[in-house]
Design a protein with these regions (language model features):
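Beta-strand/loop nucleic-acid-binding surfaces
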Residues: 2-16
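Flexible glycine-rich surface loops and low-complexity tracts that mediate binding to linear polymers
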Residues: 12-40
């Protein structure tokens, strides 16, 4: 594993690492840090969680949502770039319980037919479980979206707008408001 500031993380524990971006919890002792080599040996506190998320290219009509998001910005959390292409979005959404999380999926949709001064991306939240559940708790899921292909189609923008269906009161999509979050892109 490599951190955003160039440190190499090593561990005696092994996990299958099939993705590119992970949320990692670990601890280390000062004696396990090599400042010159910029490496540290760590003990994972939990299994690393892959946060790679898909981007679809096509008409937004072909990629609808069936559930709202609670929000994508809350207090000091909000979308941020990890590097020139990886956009990390903290998505808050309604759940029934911890087991319900596995039925939720998140993706960004880029519709190349929609052009303008800013790059507009559409966040889609879907639940694959058809069971009617009372979703009255919310959770957060960090998603890492690789925008390299989108930028190859659109060019690098000055601003990016993420549009999504927001309902901060309940999990009802019909009473959700279409909301946008704008961030500058200065790469």
């Amino acid at each position: 594993l490599m951190t955003s500031d160039g440190w190499k993380i090593k561990s005696d524990q092994s996990y299958f690492m099939g993705g590119t971006m992970y949320l990692v919890s670990y601890q280390y002792k000062d004696s396990m840090v090599d400042q010159e080599a910029k490496t540290m040996t760590v003990e994972f506190l939990s299994e690393p969680l892959c946060i790679d998320a898909p981007i679809r290219v096509g008409s937004i009509v072909d990629y609808p949502s069936n559930a709202p998001c609670y929000n994508i910005a809350y207090e000091s959390n909000g979308p941020v770039f990890y590097d020139d292409y990886i956009l990390i979005v903290p998505v808050f959404y309604w759940v029934h319980d911890g087991d319900d999380i596995k039925y939720h999926s998140l993706e960004l949709v880029y519709d190349p037919s929609i052009s303008g001064e800013v790059l507009k991306l559409h966040l889609r939240h879907n639940i694959s479980n058809d069971e009617e559940l009372r979703r009255d708790k919310y959770t957060i899921q960090y998603c890492a979206f690789d925008l390299q292909y989108v930028f190859s189609l659109s060019g690098k923008p000055d601003k990016i707008v993420i549009e999504y269906e927001k309902n901060s009161f309940n999990s009802n999509l019909e009473s959700a408001q279409t909301t946008t979050y704008t961030l500058s892109y200065n790469k």
